[in-house]
Structures are given as structure tokens and as C-alpha cells.
Amino acid sequence: MRLPGSEKVIVGYDLGNKYAQISCYVTGSEEEIRTLSSVAGSSVYTIPLALSKRQGVNQWFYGSEAIRYAGEEEGILVENLLKLARDGEPVQIDGAPIDPVALLTLFLKRSLGLLSQVTNTERIGALMITCEELDHRMLEVLTAATEGLHLKTDQICFQSHVESFYYYNLYQPEELWRHKTILCEYGDASIRTYCMECNRHTTPVVAYMEEREFPFPVPESDEKMQEIAKKLCENQMISSVYLIGEAFSRDWMKESLR
């Protein structure tokens, strides 16, 4: 559904090391937050963090199309865009050095084109970008990359995953965070977990966040996931558990979810 009037769109952009995901909310609308499909008519919501350039021509592709084009044609594939931008070293592409932050800006610009499913980038009223860690260098990178988008809004914010999880919890019904709340994020050969717990014996109430990382060498191992779940939940009062990461959408956790 495209917007008929002048409503603004609030965009949430999760920028991972290998994938990105875009959600949006139309102000004044009764519709829920919508996550944009990266493939028209499908339920594929993750966008590979990659670009490819056609050799000898200033033609670029992004996401799954970039990977496909680089495999089928003589395209030059560039992955790990966030890491490259953070490192700051020029990237040699087709015989020329290119600013890695400019590559990240190009990826952001192309991927935000998915908003055409709802509206266009002219109507972005606010943009929130989340990433795993938000230190001084990452803040510099994201600020420079978003300035290159030339959006018609100054409401551009950045959050770490820890901050995002904290604020998300606070806006949920209290029964979902009355006791410990756990988020599990499926990453590269590891499961990163965030546990939030509130101390109600203080005024004001103080929230604590614990971050842990568990090795996960065997992909989609139900047995290993069950071990992690026991370490996190055994003898604990748990209000809610969230699972994020594309691998969790597949049907492999038979015992872990019991």
C-alpha cells in the first residue's frame, strides 16, 4: 500500500556485519510496523551487506542481486561493507581506490529504495540505525554515511543493539519484562545473548543488562542450543525470550524450545 497523502515515515534500519533489515511505520496510521521484503512478493527480509560493480562500467548492484551478478557475470563483489567503512582504508575496485564510507552510503541509498513498496525516501521523517556496537569510530562512520544520503530530515539517530533491546522492552507490557528478559542473536559461529533484569528494590527501578557470547561451531545444532538455553534459563524466572537471526526462522530447534 502506497501513501496517498503527506504522511511521514519512520524508518528503522538494522545494520549488521553481513545483513541489513529495514522496517517502517507510517505516522498517523493504524497499521503496524512493517518489515520490508528484499525480494518482491516474498518473505525474505534480510539484505546481504554487499555491492558489486560491473567491470569497466559505473553500474552497481546491491544485496542478493550483487552476489548473483558477481557469480554469473564478471562483476566485482565487495562484501563486509560495515567493517571496511570502520577500518577506513580505500578499497581497490576496478583499478581505482574508493572511499569505503562512500560504498556504505551507496548501499544505504540503494537499499532504502525498498521503501518504494510503501512510499519514497522524500517522506522519511526520521531514521534510526541500529548496529551491534556503537563506539566513537562507528558513530563517525554512520554520521558520514547518512550525511551522504541527503535526506530531507535531521531526525537521524543511532543505537547499539543493547540500547535497542532495552528501549524495546520498556515499551512492552510489564508482564513481558517483570522478570528476566532474554534476547538470543544468531551470528557467525556464535550465539550472542542479552539478558535484561530490573531491580525493583531501588527507587527509581534500575535495569541491568548482561551480554554474553557462546561458541556455536555446528550450524543449527539443536543440542548445542539446548545447552545454551539451560545456562541462560535454569533456575531463573524468565518473562520472555526473543530469537533474532535468519537461522532461527528455520525448523531445527525441536528440544531447545521445550
Question: Model segments located where?
Answer:
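Phosphate-binding loop and its immediate beta->loop->alpha context
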Residues: 28-149
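Conserved phosphate-binding/catalytic loops in two-lobed NTP-binding clefts
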Residues: 151-165, 254-258
